[in-house]
């Protein structure tokens, strides 16, 4: 399935139905009074967050959504039926913005969450509504009110427990494939991953979701390599696993490059817990491993994990470290 994390759509709620002009007609009643019913309300436009989706690709093929017009009023004081609603089904984590793409309307963070984006127009009053002591037989009715029309932006920020970050070719996709059933594209060239991937990891009977985002480069927070959109997908994570490839000549510089982008982007990433790991260590001998591990520790201020998704070295330890931070974060959220 192709990935799409931002799109523009056009919505319009339904017009209200017109009120009816009608008079009571019955045998032996010569002057029946007005009995025109009111028109029905127009259909609303809703958005609903559902599980099972992790892309907005469906909105590439349909960008226009319109609620149905309310049914017109009828004689015998019958009110028209409400127009059918239309619902946009979006992945959990989708944000809805006004046309300026800056003003947030709603953040769809929970499965089943619904929000009315546009209310249908009210139905018009039938002529029975206008009967008075001075006008016993009004011969007019109101038209229904028009529905709301607006342009909105949908922006997806995936919801995962842990996010994988690092430079291109840091081994993020290989890590994800090794510990989950996700099958991201893996190859030995930069920017193999062009969109985020999700996988469910299990360790000691506990499950959590990991997001692999495309590799970050210098200037990502300013949109270089559309990195600012990639970074949005790890905003909601509880912990970051920062992978630094052992194949980097300067592991300290590789670490600080990504760390700078996270800090500069903001969005809470600067304060998010992180676990640093030296990845792809199967390519190093013992002396090289010791030297690069020491250099990385000096740069990040803590002892990095040593992992290789190819040989499975350190994978369980990395997953347990992620699980512990995630569990602590969830416990803190429940107490808050």
UniProtKB/Swiss-Prot annotation:
Which UniProt keywords are present, listed alphabetically?
Cytoplasm, GTP-binding, Hydrolase, Magnesium, Metal-binding, Nucleotide-binding
What subcellular compartments does it reside in?
Cytoplasm
Could you say which EC number(s) this protein's record lists? Answer: 3.6.5.-
Q: Where is the Obg domain?
A: 1-159
InterPro entries named in the record: G_OBG, GTP-bd, GTP-bd_Obg/CgtA, GTP1-OBG_CS, GTP1_OBG_dom, GTP1_OBG_dom_sf, OBG_GTPase, P-loop_NTPase
Q: Name one Pfam family in it.
A: MMR_HSR1
> What SUPFAM superfamilies does the record tag this protein with?
Obg GTP-binding protein N-terminal domain, P-loop containing nucleoside triphosphate hydrolases
Q: Which residues form the OBG-type G domain?
A: 160-327
Essential cofactor(s): Mg(2+)
Residue sites binding GTP per the record: 166-173, 191-195, 212-215, 279-282, 308-310
Q: Which domain of life is it from?
A: Bacteria
**Which HAMAP family does the protein's record reference?**
GTPase_Obg
**What does the UniProt record say this protein does?**
An essential GTPase which binds GTP, GDP and possibly (p)ppGpp with moderate affinity, with high nucleotide exchange rates and a fairly low GTP hydrolysis rate. Plays a role in control of the cell cycle, stress response, ribosome biogenesis and in those bacteria that undergo differentiation, in morphogenesis control.
- Which named protein is this? GTPase Obg
């Amino acid at each position: 399935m192709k990935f799409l994390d931002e799109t523009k759509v056009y919505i319009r709620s339904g017009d209200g139905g017109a009120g009816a002009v009608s008079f009571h007609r019955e045998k032996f009643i010569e002057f029946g009074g007005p009995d025109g019913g009111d028109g029905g309300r127009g259909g609303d436009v809703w958005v609903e967050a559902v599980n099972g989706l992790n892309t907005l690709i469906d909105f590439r093929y349909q960008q226009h959504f319109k609620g149905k017009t309310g049914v017109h009023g009828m004689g015998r004081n019958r009110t028209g039926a409400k127009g059918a609603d239309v619902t946009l089904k979006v992945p959990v984590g989708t944000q809805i913005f006004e046309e300026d793409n800056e003003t947030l309307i709603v953040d769809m963070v929970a499965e089943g969450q619904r929000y009315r984006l546009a209310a249908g127009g009210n139905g018009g009053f039938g002529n029975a509504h206008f009967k008075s002591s001075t006008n016993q037989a009004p011969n007019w009715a109101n038209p229904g009110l028009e529905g709301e029309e607006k342009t909105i932006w949908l922006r997806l920020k995936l919801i995962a427990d842990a996010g994988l970050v690092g430079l291109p070719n840091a081994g993020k996709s290989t890590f994800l494939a090794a510990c989950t059933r996700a099958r991201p594209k893996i190859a030995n060239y930069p920017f193999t991953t062009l969109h985020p991937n999700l996988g469910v990891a299990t360790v000691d009977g506990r499950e959590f979701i990991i997001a692999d985002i495309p590799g970050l480069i210098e200037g990502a927070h300013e949109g270089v390599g559309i990195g600012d959109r990639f970074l949005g997908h790890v905003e909601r994570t509880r912990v970051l696993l920062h992978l630094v490839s052992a194949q980097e000549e300067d592991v300290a510089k590789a670490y600080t490059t990504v760390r700078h982008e996270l800090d500069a982007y903001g969005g809470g990433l600067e304060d998010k817990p992180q676990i640093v790991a030296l990845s792809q260590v199967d390519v190093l001998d013992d002396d090289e491993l010791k030297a690069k591990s020491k250099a990385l520790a000096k740069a990040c201020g803590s002892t990095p994990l040593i992992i290789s998704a190819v040989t499975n070295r350190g994978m369980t330890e990395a997953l347990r470290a992620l699980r512990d931070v995630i569990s602590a974060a969830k416990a803190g959220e429940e107490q808050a």
